[in-house]
Amino acid sequence: MTLLDPLANALSHITNSERVGKKEVYIKPASKLIGEVLRVMQENGYIGEFEFIDDGRAGIYRVQLIGKINKAGAIKPRFPVKAREYEAWEKRFLPAFEFGILIVSTSQGVMTHKEAIEKGIGGRLIAYVY
């Protein structure tokens, strides 16, 4: 069976593992996009260390959970957002102002919506975490 959205699967796997109190989770298949999203989540303090394990196929990410995630999910479809429009999308996907992050894929890489606002660039919304 094919996996339609590996990013959505990875984020729901992380959320479900956090809810049951697990300390680590294995995410497969691994991809560059999932790795970049995990890096952004780690920089913002939502997960601990993560590492790539090569299994001879697509690979696996081992992620240390620290219990800070209430909800994480992929945004489908991947909406294009201009630099001035982040506040409207923040109201739509996040529960409160300055609580949580939107993860955006831009021409300068994957980053949070706050970093994109500082740099004044738009991009495509790919996920939210709070």
UniProtKB/Swiss-Prot annotation:
Pfam family for this entry, one: Ribosomal_S8
Gene Ontology CC, one term: ribosome
Domain of life per record: Archaea
UniProt-listed Gene3D superfamilies: 3.30.1370.30, 3.30.1490.10
One of the GO BP terms on file: translation
Entry keywords, A to Z: Ribonucleoprotein, Ribosomal protein, RNA-binding, rRNA-binding
GO molecular function: rRNA binding; structural constituent of ribosome
Function per UniProt: One of the primary rRNA binding proteins, it binds directly to 16S rRNA central domain where it helps coordinate assembly of the platform of the 30S subunit.
Record NCBIfam families: PRK04034.1 (NF003115)
Family: Belongs to the universal ribosomal protein uS8 family.
Subunit field text: Part of the 30S ribosomal subunit.
Protein name: Small ribosomal subunit protein uS8
Originating species: Thermococcus onnurineus (strain NA1)
Gene, per the UniProt record: rps8
